[in-house]
């Protein structure tokens, strides 16, 4: 059976998790996909078993001697880990700071997209830090960055307050905005209502309502899109230098 389609490079954005052929040690302790301890075996043999089931061989404890690996669906594993992280985040009710990067040359279309993203983050109860990075002679025209940040403030002032006004630090101009108290109250009420419904279901012996991950998924999607755009901007800037 051919190796599963998962591309190991997908794991590189987070902690380095070794899977499949990236597990280089000759011998490992293996846990089956059903949780059964299969004992110590040669890595190539464990990989063969994973392939036969159409699954991945994933290193779950690299510090053990020998390292512990588990046969599982890595795509599902990553999804479950994200879900656990979201759950922990909900319980902590921590206000995150989302960063949005700009350039003096950011065009109107991209500026509007990034402002909409900021509006979404602020509406979800997060603070937003805007950074405008200057390259080369761009630093001689800081007024362009100031205009961009003023435009952003104007379009977000309905739901957010300026926490730190635009300021220059070396070759970067920054602005920090925070959700207005009414927005934070609305977010807190929604979380409290969801938790109350969950606790009530548990007390009545019913299955707890599934958590609605739509908002978290939208936020994550926006962050990925912003990251991709930042990479494109960096490539373009390096090409023109």
From Swiss-Prot:
**Location(s), subcellular:** Cytoplasm
What main location does UniProt list?
cytoplasm
User: Which SUPFAM superfamilies does the annotation name?
Assistant: Translation initiation factor IF3, C-terminal domain (SSF55200), Translation initiation factor IF3, N-terminal domain (SSF54364)
Which keywords belong to this entry? Cytoplasm, Initiation factor, Protein biosynthesis
Span list, region Disordered? 193-241
Q: Where is the composition biased (Acidic residues)?
A: 212-241
GO molecular function terms noted in the UniProt entry: ribosome binding; translation initiation factor activity
Q: Where is the composition biased (Basic and acidic residues)?
A: 193-203
Q: Name one GO biological process term.
A: ribosome disassembly
What Pfam families does the annotation carry?
Answer: IF3_C (PF00707), IF3_N (PF05198)
- One cellular component term from this protein's GO annotations in UniProt: cytosol
Purpose of the protein: IF-3 binds to the 30S ribosomal subunit and shifts the equilibrium between 70S ribosomes and their 50S and 30S subunits in favor of the free subunits, thus enhancing the availability of 30S subunits on which protein synthesis initiation begins.
Subunit (UniProt): Monomer.
| Family indicated by similarity | Belongs to the IF-3 family.
- Which NCBIfam families does its entry note? infC (TIGR00168)
Please name the PANTHER family in this protein's record.
TRANSLATION INITIATION FACTOR IF-3, TRANSLATION INITIATION FACTOR IF-3, MITOCHONDRIAL
* Protein's UniProt name: Translation initiation factor IF-3
